[in-house]
């Protein structure tokens, strides 16, 4: 949904845990030889509905991860999490990657692969069914997953936007 503001400002009272999604060694060839550097995709979350992602590039792996964490802390968004799952089905596309996220019953676990799993676990979702289609590029998968999560709305948010009670959302 365009125009919806669910961004979160980073403060010291939010305790964020970081997860490394992917690391890539990049080689620049010059006439003097090869120069190696590293890029790292990092996801940070508080496991209570706040998530962010970042990309760090540096000459050393640890420096790239640290830059990625700092970048992720600047891109935080709030996501509705209901009883350990998502409120409704949602799909999103970024580049060639398309993701489908569906709520699951308690005890199912996180049924998702690779980059999607890191994002879903960092946001605090414990039961979900997720599928990726198209590109398996971790950059695009992370962005598409966060896009799908940030488009989700729970009943309270819908009622607030419409100016009605939560009961009226379900009864019509």
From Swiss-Prot:
InterPro entries: Ribosomal_Su5_D2-typ_SF (IPR020568), Ribosomal_uS5 (IPR000851), Ribosomal_uS5_bac-type (IPR005712), Ribosomal_uS5_C (IPR005324), Ribosomal_uS5_N (IPR013810), Ribosomal_uS5_N_CS (IPR018192), Ribsml_uS5_D2-typ_fold_subgr (IPR014721). Residues 16-79 form the S5 DRBM domain. One of its GO terms (biological process) is translation. GO terms for cellular component: cytosolic small ribosomal subunit. Keywords: Ribonucleoprotein, Ribosomal protein, RNA-binding, rRNA-binding. GO terms for molecular function: rRNA binding; structural constituent of ribosome. SUPFAM superfamilies: dsRNA-binding domain-like, Ribosomal protein S5 domain 2-like. PANTHER family: MITOCHONDRIAL RIBOSOMAL PROTEIN S5. Part of the 30S ribosomal subunit. Contacts proteins S4 and S8. Belongs to the universal ribosomal protein uS5 family. The N-terminal domain interacts with the head of the 30S subunit; the C-terminal domain interacts with the body and contacts protein S4. The interaction surface between S4 and S5 is involved in control of translational fidelity. With S4 and S12 plays an important role in translational accuracy. This is Small ribosomal subunit protein uS5. The lineage of its organism: Bacteria, Pseudomonadati, Bacteroidota, Bacteroidia, Bacteroidales.
